[in-house]
Amino acid sequence: MKKMFFTVAIAVSIVSVTTAFANPDGLQQKKNENQFAESFKQLSRDTAWEQKEKVDLKFNTYHPQGMTKIGDLYYMSSVEILEKPVKYEEPRDGYDRTTGKGIGHLFVFNQQGELLKDIRLGEGDMYHPGGIAFDGESIWVSVAEYRPNSESIIYKVDPKTMQPQEMFRTNDHIGGILRDGEKGNLKAVSWGSRTFYEFDSKGKVLSKDSNPSHFIDYQDCESAGKDNMICSGITELPQQGSSTGKYELGGLALLDMKTMEIEHELPISLVSSQGHTVTRNPVYLENTGEAIKLFAVPDDDKSSMLVYETTKLNTK
């Protein structure tokens, strides 16, 4: 089958966009890394988050998945569902549902919510991007079938050229991926983050372990320096009483990237205008030195990027 890579340029100045992509502020990503984990450990269920911005995204976001930030630009993965997967009454060939149909996207937008690039990723039944992360050089994106225990393609995308490169394929649904530094191995989570993986750059599985935590399913993870990673996510719980709806519990977790043990975790009670927990899908955390900023896009289709900040952290 032919590999499908499509890059769509939206009406912007070629010169200005090239300049923006050619100078990603990698240093900004590493600034204050040494204190990021310690600052994160000060967060709790009682932490006050103040909403600073609401940026309306001026394009159809479909079903957003993961997000990272480089300089003043935001990169967000999303799945456009053309045909929703349908669950089988009984498993077939090891699968619990049909493949469905869709298109994988990696959107690039600015601080005004304007779409600058739409990079299409995937092939055949593998159209569902997951959580993404920037390693200081490349953006890592997994694109999987929209069902558990399936298959995935792992890409890295150069933020200067916005060209994707397939790195390897693997036999599971990879729901999120990040690299341990610019040259290290890759850490990944499966469907619902029930399994932790470690790959080398060629896709060899170095370790595969069960996730001992059942607090939330990790959706999006990013490096937090000092061999740490921060993951955000959600779990859906039954409502009390006669309600047939689900209660969305959001949360954040700090993990040791070497052992994948939880160092610190907390629930997040913030909700969007559509009633979703803000950590439902794309989340990016930024340490400013005196505060932690949380960027989130929890709603589908007509979305806004919500920006929260918490201060009064002990930064000594």
What are these regions (language model features)?
Residues Y62-G66, G124-G131, N171-G181, H214-S223, ...:
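Repeated scaffold domains used in trafficking and secretory/extracellular systems
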Residues G71-D72, G136-E137, E182-G184, K226-N228, ...:
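Short coil/turn segments that connect the beta-strands within blades of beta-propeller domains
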Residues H214-E261:
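Loop/turn-rich, solvent-exposed surfaces of beta-rich toroidal or solenoidal domains
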